[in-house]
Amino acid sequence: MFIYYINMKTEKTNYIEILIIKLIFFILTPIKIIFFIAKKIIKNPIIYRFIFKYLLYMQNKIIIINNKEYFYRIPKKKEYWEWFSAKPLYVNGKLINEIKTKEQRINFSLGKMIIKESESLTELEYVLLDLFWFGPFQMKYQNILRQNDIIIKKGVKNIKKIFQENNKFKGINLIFQKTDICKIYSGKFYTYERITEDNILLIYVFIKNKD
């Protein structure tokens, strides 16, 4: 099941916290036993109340996770993509990461380099790039520990793998026929790839007119 509308105000998920909660889920019963024994030994009521409140808090978090089927991640911001890779990355022909090499980054930070401005991506184009690079914004809690293996249903192109494993490409240009986030997110699209004379990989994303 995939959502057809993306709410940009989705909650931010703390993966480390959820991992800890999952571990505590399996050891909560022995912790309660230890806590019961400790209660007989520890005479300080402040420590007792602190431990009790913390266990109660963690137990409530477990209940929330067990009753909640999905979690949502927030798309990366513009600043993330501008420093993302040493290879040029484009969306609809617009260059995202102007500073391409380590040497250029150092020179830019030292004020020895002037970056030529190019047309900026729209907010929706950043969302589409994030969607194709990192996968769905909606994921099941049961898959949270292997979220890197999850891709969008019905065949979203894993451009991240292509980008990292193929040194022959100097860059990638992700071209959308239409920025229809609803159809793309629900898998109603197909892709076509070709390589330019400059060794730039073009990935065209076409919207399916019929299901």
Swiss-Prot record:
Q: Which organism is it from?
A: Euglena longa
What is the top-level taxon of the source organism?
Eukaryota
| Pfam families referenced in this protein's UniProt entry, alphabetically | DUF613
**Gene Ontology CC: one annotated term:** plastid
User: What keywords are annotated for this sequence in UniProt?
Assistant: Plastid
Name of the protein in its database record: Uncharacterized 25.9 kDa protein in rpl12-rps7 intergenic region
InterPro entries from the xrefs? Answer: DUF613
Family that this chain belongs to = Belongs to the A.longa ORF167/ORF288 family.
Q: Where in the cell is it found?
A: Plastid
Question: What's the chief localization of this chain?
Answer: plastid
